Amino acid sequence: MPKVKALQCALALEISSVTCPGVVLKDKEDIYLSICVFGQYKKTQCVPATFPLVFNARMVFEKVFPDAVDPGDVVTQLEYDTAVFELIQLVPPVGETLSTYDENTRDFMFPGPNQMSGHHDSNRQVTMRRISGLRGNAPRLEFSTTSVITECLISSRKCHTQDKFIYHLAPVEKSHGRLQNRTSRSQKKKSKSPERSKYCINAKNYEQPTISSKSHSPSPYTKRRMCELSEDTRRRLAHLNLGPYEFKKETDKPPFVIRHVDPPSPRADTLLGSSGRDCERDGWSRVHNDHSHLGCCRPKDYKVIRTPHGRDFDDSLEKCEEYLSPRSCSKPRHSARTLLVHSAPSTMPKHSPSPVLNRASLRERFHSDWCSPSNCDEIHDRVKNVLKSHQAHQRHLYDERDLEKDDELELKRSLLCRDSAYDSDPEYSSCQQPRGTFHLDDGEYWSNRAASYKGKSHRPIFENSMDKMYRNLYKKACSSASHTQESF
């Protein structure tokens, strides 16, 4: 590879201290100074948080300009670069920047108007920005610079530059540190170690972790946020083992889905109500021939009607029979209820039918003839035995007592309604009379319940009442006629 000449600009920076009289920091964490020149970041060692901050650090920044022809071109390109100083305190979680100072790199390296190469300026002072939240003077930075522009070969630039980076990696803390650094530098130049190229490649200071990141363990939230930074920052923070985290945004979450169930149609509701009322009938339950089921009533029958939904049309009727717990057969009751079941849409997965629906009826399972004379006779005999039992007799007495009480209550209610109706309006009294109750005579009332209790029909009672009425009218007419004759 041919060697090409280029111009190299080097800056030797010596930082002595940072002073800020009359200012006391609230936090007591250590402080360090971060410097960025030529796009290269370097930092001093940490010092206690008490002014003045004495650093006594020395560092070198170098950059090669292969396209530059003379030093004037280098100075022109330096005008597009900025030198930045940051005073950082190690306050968790990521540190706090107390004060900053930035200046054009050309003016920072060559403060004079005609100074280009070989400039040395000692005991320089610049005023940094005021610390936010604190009263008092702004921090003042004391340092010295030496700027040099020289020719170099591009092929040997990396090793030459990185060797100087290794030499200036450890800042100077004591007054005799310069002699030690110079001695180590001369020894490194003389020694030709085979690992020299390795140090030159891995000694990039701006890719190393910062002191602030090494001083504390970041929280899980900070880790996720750090993973969202640039690739250069990820490489610089690789020692934290952040992992392949990605901060999830709100837009990445899947939408919350709510299933909507179609309400039953009003037609189905009316069909359900009417069929439920019309199909409910009272009757004696039929008992099976098997003696193991004696004393049990036949369970209610449920008819399942599937209405068409979409393209599914199922008009078949399936009969479901289920056993109920044994109960008294003194008042057996049989009711057939019709259940309306909407079939699921074709897109929805259909559930497997219940095994009860596919089960054969009692007649098919036991092959018995319900209409045979033997079954009918057996049923009548069993019903007679049940009615003659002590339990049925007690229940019959209770029913008679209940009928008497109901008749008395009904008579009292009719009398109360009649009195209240007569007090308000005579015409309104007819509307307030209980339905099916008629006034006969001498405070007697006749109703359907009284007819069933006495065993008489309405016709003879009506004729008797009319006979009494006409007889009374005739007696009154006769008595009135006799009174008039006596008066004359």
Swiss-Prot record:
Q: List the disulfide bonds.
A: none
Q: Name one Pfam family in it.
A: SPATA6
Q: Where is this cross-link: Glycyl lysine isopeptide (Lys-Gly) (interchain with G-Cter in SUMO2)?
A: 248
Domain of life (superkingdom): Eukaryota
Residue numbers spanned by region Disordered: 176-199, 256-275
Q: Where is it located?
A: Secreted; Cell projection, Cilium, Flagellum
Which UniProt keywords are listed?
A: Cell projection, Cilium, Developmental protein, Differentiation, Flagellum, Glycoprotein, Isopeptide bond, Phosphoprotein, Secreted, Signal, Spermatogenesis, Ubl conjugation
Ubl conjugation: is it a keyword of this entry?
Answer: yes
Q: What does this protein do?
A: Required for formation of the sperm connecting piece during spermiogenesis. Sperm connecting piece is essential for linking the developing flagellum to the head during late spermiogenesis. May be involved in myosin-based microfilament transport through interaction with myosin subunits.
Protein name (database record)? Spermatogenesis-associated protein 6
Write down the species.
Answer: Homo sapiens
Which lineage ranks, top first, belong to the organism behind this chain?
Eukaryota, Metazoa, Chordata, Craniata, Vertebrata
